């Protein structure tokens, strides 16, 4: 039996040979109409999706053409940069400039990259979230935020000025979650057609959750209030919370975001006593902000433990922040412990 030749996917009972769900591009065109700012936003999202399809293809090939996890440098925060980090950055910057963005802020560059002088939007992006998972089969993602480019420093605006935000999750399928301020939409990439098709609209988080996502290995470094939150949850139905909790931790914010948006849950990565973690670890502008925008659009919340993420005015491009997001009720409960 030969394994060479054209790839033909398994067809399951009940599968259709046609995908009739609306394409994301068509949705964006209808949403944008003739409005200039909306058209610029739609073009930027389309550019990101074009880049995501190319990135997905490279991820799928693993180490066959070369080692994507090869270390090639460090960024401004001394985080190690892999070959695929730099390649992803270059890809998205090139496509976003071609799409007319005024400027692009990437995790992999110290300063924003200038684009079209009269562009209407500014795009903040983490080209490849979770690159430590490269080669392990664990989740990877791209996450982005779009702001109006109507100030001298568009990336130092509070998150509540975002026009749109979204992420692409590279897992056993390539999935998109995004919002243009009219609810959260899910879509999946169809490799047969090269198109993202909408699979769910008006995604809504549940009212209650018993799923927690956090790095349990750092519990001893958390504040007394946060340690009490974890301990009370782990006591389950015999403790003050009165019900059992499950733990989920994927090691990539986009992966945890995608799971929580589908199943509910609460994620936290807050400040702790370790050197370098005093203000949290995730980036406010291009990680916490888009997550907070999507959480709000799905009926959830996102805070730094006490303040709404969307109300925080960044002071620097790569500012770090504590982040708590997910089901609104649980975010509020954690906030009570956080304040202790």
Curated annotation (Swiss-Prot):
Catalytic activity: beta-D-fructose 1,6-bisphosphate + H2O = beta-D-fructose 6-phosphate + phosphate
Source superkingdom: Bacteria
E.C. number: 3.1.3.11
GO BP: fructose 1,6-bisphosphate metabolic process; fructose 6-phosphate metabolic process; fructose metabolic process; gluconeogenesis; sucrose biosynthetic process
Enzyme type, top EC level: hydrolase
GO CC term, one of those recorded: cytosol
Cofactor(s) the protein requires to work: Mg(2+)
Stated family: Belongs to the FBPase class 1 family.
Protein name in UniProt: Fructose-1,6-bisphosphatase class 1
Gene source species: Brucella anthropi (strain ATCC 49188 / DSM 6882 / CCUG 24695 / JCM 21032 / LMG 3331 / NBRC 15819 / NCTC 12168 / Alc 37) (Ochrobactrum anthropi)
Organism taxonomic ancestry: Bacteria, Pseudomonadati, Pseudomonadota, Alphaproteobacteria, Hyphomicrobiales
Gene designation per UniProt: fbp
């Amino acid at each position: 039996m030969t394994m060479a030749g054209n790839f033909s996917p398994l067809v399951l009972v009940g599968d259709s040979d046609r995908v009739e769900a609306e394409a994301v591009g068509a949705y964006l065109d209808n949403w944008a109409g003739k409005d200039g700012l909306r058209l610029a936003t739609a073009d930027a999202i389309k550019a990101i999706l074009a880049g995501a399809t190319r990135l997905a293809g490279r991820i799928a090939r693993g180490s066959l053409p070369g080692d994507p996890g090869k270390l090639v440098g460090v960024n401004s925060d001394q985080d190690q940069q892999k070959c695929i980090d730099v390649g992803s950055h270059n890809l998205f910057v090139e496509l976003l400039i071609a799409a007319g963005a005024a400027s692009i802020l990437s995790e992999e560059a110290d300063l924003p990259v200038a684009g079209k002088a009269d562009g209407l939007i500014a795009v903040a992006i983490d080209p490849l979230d979770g690159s430590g998972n490269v080669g392990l089969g664990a989740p990877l993602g791209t996450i982005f935020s779009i702001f109006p480019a109507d100030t001298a420093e568009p990336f130092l605006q509070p998150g509540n000025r975002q026009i749109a935000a979204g992420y692409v999750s590279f897992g056993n399928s390539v999935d998109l979650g995004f919002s243009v301020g009219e609810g959260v939409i899910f879509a999946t990439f169809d490799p047969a057609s090269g198109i993202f098709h909408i699979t769910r609209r008006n995604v809504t988080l549940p009212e209650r959750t018993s799923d927690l996502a956090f790095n349990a290995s750092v519990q001893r470094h958390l504040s007394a209030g946060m340690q009490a939150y974890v301990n009370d949850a782990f006591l389950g139905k015999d403790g003050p919370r009165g019900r059992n909790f499950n733990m989920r931790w994927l090691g990539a914010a986009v992966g945890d975001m995608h799971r929580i948006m589908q199943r509910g849950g609460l994620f936290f990565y807050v400040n702790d006593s370790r050197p370098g973690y005093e203000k949290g670890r995730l980036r406010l502008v291009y990680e916490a902000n888009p997550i907070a925008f999507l959480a709000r659009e799905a009926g959830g919340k996102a805070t730094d433990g006490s303040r709404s993420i969307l109300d925080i005015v960044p002071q620097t491009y790569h500012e770090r922040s504590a982040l708590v997001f997910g089901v609104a009720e649980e975010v509020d409960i954690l906030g009570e412990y956080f304040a202790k």
